[in-house]
Every structure is written in structure tokens, then in C-alpha cells.
């Protein structure tokens, strides 16, 4: 079966594990005498080959509070690894990313709590997630998780961060625990119709999201709260098509080089001057995308699509229009002659006439009819940035080709 072939590609070898252990030895030496644990997919045995981020959590008594993590704990960790290649990253609170032998190690300060439902910060639940998963998955189950993760990565729905709004690693593990194996997850997902409820434990509150998986270690939390309806739909359709015609294309989509430019495509390249939390930046980018689309439609442009991609510092926004050319003037349709609002319409407009249908009309001048200017004005980033903008002429990179193509390679 194709899944066995995929596993040969994505399952780590003993050599891979030894390499990770060497990196962990360096980290263990630096964090000596601290209360720390290795967490995440490496600890759970569900990690993918050549996709290794190690999570190391340093625990502090819950009584010290969140502010202690952000200052004292963070400084303590930095002092221990400052001679290594490291950067600061930001989520609910700051943490450290160390790069050793091309392996990224996230060192995250957290509070030691009694149970997952007593979590003070989001990361405090992590040890309980690890314990739950390792106690419910055997070796075959871990491979089934690997298949599901790679499938979701291939179709673009993996990652709970705001930029993606997809499935977290923990969500994939719970899906395998609930349904049993990769194929069974796809069989059920192919029949999904939201709202979808998957209950490994009874929920402790009412959830409103389209996909609901109450967290077994904290039933007040929906594990899949971040998953967008678009990604749920994409996963369901991909599952249906894979079951009909299994292909490596779902796991490792091919790169399409040529794609015709349809309509007019505006490219906005943003370079951010400051480092910030990825979720904060992408929250602002998503608002910008929505605002650009609304503004262009309000000014009379026919918008085909607006998308954004990139990382925390370099972001591309692509705006596809039926045409970038729009008239300086437009037909303004007014009320019927018998309407009580005709006097107001006449007062506010010039060049007014009565049409054959008994309705009043006027000619109005657009306040703005340059799409590039409108798009730039509606970027709502709160950090300083440089911008380069141009209308697409040539086929450029894979992301732009993907934007132009629209249809996933696994679908056609």
C-alpha cells in the first residue's frame, strides 16, 4: 500500500534519533538542576523525519505567576544558553529558540500545575497532553499519526498558528486515538458536515466552532477551536479524493512551474522592521487582507481573490482582480419616482435624470480608482514596514504559481 511507502520516507531512522539525542545532551547540560522535561512530538514518538523541532519545557512553581516566566525565568534560561545560536520568540509569553546542528530546540518556561484543567498559561497543559497521548498510542498508532500529519501538511491544513488556522499535532494524535488509524480518519472525515463533534471526553462547556474535540486533559477547551471552516472543508474533500485514488501527491504535492495570469494581479511585498509574535503579525495581516478586499469591492472593483503568505518578517499579499482598470465615473442608481427619498437623492447628486423605468439616476465620480493605492491604504500593520508593489507580469515563485492555479495539485 502507498501508506507503507510514505512511512519509509517520513519515519525517523535510528540514526536520526541518535542525532536528536546528541542535541538534547547539550541542552540537558545547560539546564542542569532546573525542573525541565522534553515534550512535543519527539517525546510522544510522533515526529516526522527532517521535520524536527524539539520542545523543552522548564517548569517553575505555579505560585511565582506568569510575570516571573516573562522576566526572571526567561533571563535565567538565556544566561544558560547565551553562547549558543539562539533567538527570542513570542507566543502567550516569550520563549527561546536554540539552533544546534540544524535542529531547532524551543525552550519554553511554564508553570507546574496539578492537572491540565488547572493551567494558568496555555503551555502548562503540555505535560498532560504528552502523558495522555503516550498512554493511548502504541507504535503502530504513532505511525498512523505520522501519516495523518504528512497528509495534512501536503494539503496545507497542518498548523494551529493563526497564519494557517489548521490542525495542531495534538489534534492529529487525538483523531488517531478516536478513530483508530489513518484510513479510518479519512473515511469519517470524508463524510463530515459541520458542526462535527468528536468526544474522547465529555465537554465541560458549550462550543460554537465547526469542529469540536474537547481536550481530554481540560474539557473546558476545544482542541480544534483554531481550525477554520476552509481547512475543515479542504481536509474532508482531500480525504474523499484520496480514498478514491490514493497518491503520493496528497503527501508531497508536485510543483507546477507554469500558470497563466488571469485578470490583473497586484503583488505587495512587505518587509517588517521589527520582530513580533507570529500570531500578532498574522492577525493584522488577515485583517489587512479582509480590509483590502472590502475596500476594493466598495470602490467598484471585481475581486477574484486576495491571499497572503510568508513568515513573520517577509510577507506577500496577492490581489487578483478581473481588471485593474475602472472608470473615473460610474452610474449611481437612485430611488423610484414615488419614493420619499427622492428629494434627498436630488440634493446630494448632480447630473440627475429619470430613467425609462421611473427610477432616478446620476453620474458620480469615484473618490479613488487606483487599485494599488486602495490596497496600500488598507494595510493595518502596527509595526514599521517597507513595501514594494507591482502588477504581475512574469511567472515568479512557487507560491505565486499556487495562488494563480487555485486548484490543489491533488484535486486535478
Curated annotation (Swiss-Prot):
Annotated ATP binding sites: 41, 44, 129, 149, 158
Disulphides: none
Binding site for Mg(2+): 53, 55, 106
Reactions accelerated catalytically: a tRNA precursor + 2 CTP + ATP = a tRNA with a 3' CCA end + 3 diphosphate; a tRNA with a 3' CCA end + 2 CTP + ATP = a tRNA with a 3' CCACCA end + 3 diphosphate
Cofactor(s), by name: Mg(2+)
Entry-linked CDD domains: NT_2-5OAS_ClassI-CCAase (cd05400)
Biological process per Gene Ontology, one example term: tRNA 3'-terminal CCA addition
PANTHER family: CCA-ADDING ENZYME (PTHR39643:SF1)
Role according to the record: Catalyzes the addition and repair of the essential 3'-terminal CCA sequence in tRNAs without using a nucleic acid template. Adds these three nucleotides in the order of C, C, and A to the tRNA nucleotide-73, using CTP and ATP as substrates and producing inorganic pyrophosphate. tRNA 3'-terminal CCA addition is required both for tRNA processing and repair. Also involved in tRNA surveillance by mediating tandem CCA addition to generate a CCACCA at the 3' terminus of unstable tRNAs. While stable tRNAs receive only 3'-terminal CCA, unstable tRNAs are marked with CCACCA and rapidly degraded.
Family (UniProt): Belongs to the tRNA nucleotidyltransferase/poly(A) polymerase family. Archaeal CCA-adding enzyme subfamily.
Protein name: CCA-adding enzyme
The organism of origin for this protein: Saccharolobus islandicus (strain Y.G.57.14 / Yellowstone #1) (Sulfolobus islandicus)
Lineage, opening ranks: Archaea, Thermoproteota, Thermoprotei, Sulfolobales, Sulfolobaceae
Gene name linked to the record: cca
Amino acid at each position: 500500500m502507498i501508506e507503507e511507502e510514505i512511512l519509509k520516507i517520513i519515519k525517523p531512522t535510528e540514526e536520526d534519533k541518535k542525532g536528536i539525542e546528541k542535541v538534547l545532551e547539550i541542552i540537558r547540560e545547560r539546564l542542569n538542576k532546573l525542573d525541565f522535561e522534553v515534550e512535543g512530538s519527539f517525546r510522544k514518538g510522533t515526529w516526522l523525519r527532517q521535520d524536527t523541532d524539539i520542545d523543552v519545557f522548564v517548569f517553575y512553581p505555579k505560585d511565582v505567576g506568569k510575570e516571573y516566566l516573562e522576566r526572571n525565568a526567561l533571563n535565567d534560561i538565556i544566561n544558560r544558553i547565551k553562547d549558543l545560536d539562539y533567538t527570542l520568540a513570542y507566543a502567550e509569553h516569550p520563549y527561546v529558540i536554540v539552533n544546534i546542528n540544524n535542529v531547532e530546540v524551543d525552550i519554553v518556561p511554564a508553570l507546574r500545575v496539578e492537572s491540565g484543567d488547572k493551567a494558568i498559561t496555555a503551555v502548562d497543559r503540555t505535560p498532560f497532553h504528552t502523558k495522555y497521548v503516550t498512554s493511548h498510542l502504541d507504535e503502530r498508532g504513532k505511525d498512523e499519526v505520522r501519516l495523518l500529519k504528512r497528509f495534512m501538511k501536503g494539503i496545507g491544513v497542518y498548523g494551529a498558528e493563526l497564519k494557517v488556522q489548521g490542525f495542531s499535532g495534538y489534534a492529529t494524535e487525538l483523531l488517531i486515538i478516536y478513530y483508530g488509524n489513518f484510513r479510518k480518519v479519512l473515511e469519517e472525515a470524508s463524510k463530515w458536515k459541520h458542526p462535527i463533534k468528536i468526544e474522547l471526553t465529555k465537554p465541560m462547556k458549550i462550543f460554537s466552532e465547526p469542529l469540536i474535540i474537547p481536550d481530554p486533559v481540560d474539557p473546558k477547551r476545544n482542541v480544534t477551536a483554531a481550525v477554520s471552516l476552509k481547512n475543515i472543508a479542504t481536509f474532508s474533500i482531500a480525504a474523499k479524493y484520496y480514498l478514491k485514488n490514493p497518491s503520493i501527491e496528497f503527501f508531497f504535492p508536485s510543483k507546477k512551474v507554469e500558470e497563466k495570469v488571469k485578470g490583473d494581479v497586484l503583488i505587495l511585498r512587505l518587509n517588517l522592521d521589527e520582530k513580533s509574535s507570529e500570531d500578532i503579525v498574522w492577525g493584522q495581516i488577515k485583517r489587512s487582507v479582509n480590509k483590502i478586499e472590502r475596500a476594493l469591492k466598495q470602490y467598484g472593483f471585481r475581486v477574484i481573490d486576495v491571499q497572503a503568505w510568508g513568515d513573520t518578517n517577509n510577507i506577500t499579499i496577492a490581489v487578483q482582480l478581473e481588471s485593474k482598470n475602472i472608470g473615473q465615473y460610474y452610474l449611481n442608481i437612485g430611488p423610484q419616482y414615488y419614493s420619499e427619498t427622492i428629494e434627498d437623492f436630488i440634493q446630494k447628486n448632480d447630473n440627475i435624470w429619470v430613467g425609462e423605468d421611473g427610477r432616478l439616476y446620476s453620474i458620480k465620480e469615484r473618490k479613488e480608482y487606483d487599485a494599488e493605492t486602495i490596497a496600500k491604504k488598507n494595510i493595518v500593520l502596527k509595526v514599521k514596514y517597507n513595501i514594494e508593489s507591482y502588477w504581475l507580469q512574469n511567472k515568479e515563485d512557487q507560491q505565486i504559481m499556487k495562488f494563480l492555479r487555485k486548484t490543489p495539485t491533488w484535486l486535478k
